[in-house]
Amino acid sequence: MKNMKSVYDGCSNTFTYDRPAFVKEPETTTTTAKPTTTTTATKPTTTKYTVTGTLPNARVKASKSNYDLRIKLPSGVTSYYLEDKYTSRQLFMSCAGNYVSHFNNASNRYAKSSMSGFTVKYNSTKKRTYVYVKASSSYRGYAVSFDNGYAYIKWGTPKTMYKNILVLDAGHGGSDSGATGNRLREKDLTLSIVLAAKKQFDKDKNYAVYYTRTTDTYPSLTARSQLANDVGADYFLSCHINSASATAKGSETLYNSQGYKATNGVTSYKWAANVHNFTKAATGFTNRGLVNRTGLAVLRHTRTASTLTEFGFITNKTEAASMKANTDKYGKAMFNSVVKMFQTNPSKR
């Protein structure tokens, strides 16, 4: 055999072999695999905001890529109230708690566009912080979005920002009582009707509604028309109560045949006819129809489709009592007339 030597031993008659050296097998190393750890990326938490108030829906949206003013919000505050305080040309924002120092800190806001004012107040009674943003001395519409700790605010002319614009006028007011009869004053009835309509509009943000008055004040006739012209209203609606003899009765609606059209081409006559259908249905009074009145200031100077509706006669005892009891019903009828008009005749914006 290869690598073996044979030796004969004469005494023992024994063969002895030189055995080859033992070859050690290579060691096998066993490695225990560590369990694989899977790392899942944590998605950033998205803050949810609760927004209430009467600010209308805007056709132009505010976002972190489209804004005029960016405001850093206080940490942990996620509920806000928004309102267009157009009489003072301001956007109003409020939240619970005292954050005056936070909002007054200039480093917490950044303006891409110039603005007329930024004011912060604390209401100790309601325990809320009030923020007033004044974009301009002229009327402005606003859009606001809340995203990841910031409020983004966009503004522009009302007709740029809002799709459906109405001016609602409560006739008379202040020192001008209007017609009187049966212990009632026209200015009180018209205001009650308009405020009832406002309750409906406040719940539907598809409409930007400007009111000539919401308290017992007297805006001039010029101011009423000018409001509609300044905001670029689609429609103007003035609420009134008639007066004559004790036997006069019925509902009628006035229009100006020489007046302006709405932005979508609707005439004052068509607008008046729409409103009158709701007025007469709500009152149930005698239908006196549509009346052409070219001399009325608010119908002559308003540069859009405009109408003035007379619900009934304050001098008629039966109608006066009915009107006093049904202002909420009439207000809802005015709301429904506006909704119907915009649905059947959308604005061109």
PLM region descriptions:
Residues 176-184, 244-274:
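A short, glycine/acidic-enriched catalytic loop
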Residues 1-166:
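Short linear recognition/processing motifs and adjacent strand/loop elements at protein termini
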Residues 238-241, 254, 289-349:
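Active-site-adjacent mobile loop/cap segments within catalytic or ligand-binding domains
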Residues 150-227, 231, 257:
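Active-site histidine-acidic residue metal-binding/catalytic motifs
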Residues 266-292:
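Active-site-adjacent substrate-binding region
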Residues 191-194, 198, 222-225, 251, ...:
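Extracytoplasmic/secreted envelope proteins and their assembly/folding machinery
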Residues 172-175, 214-219, 241-247, 258-262, ...:
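Solvent-exposed loop/turn segments at secondary-structure junctions
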Residues 195-206, 229-233, 276-284, 328, ...:
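Sec-exported extracytoplasmic/periplasmic mature domains
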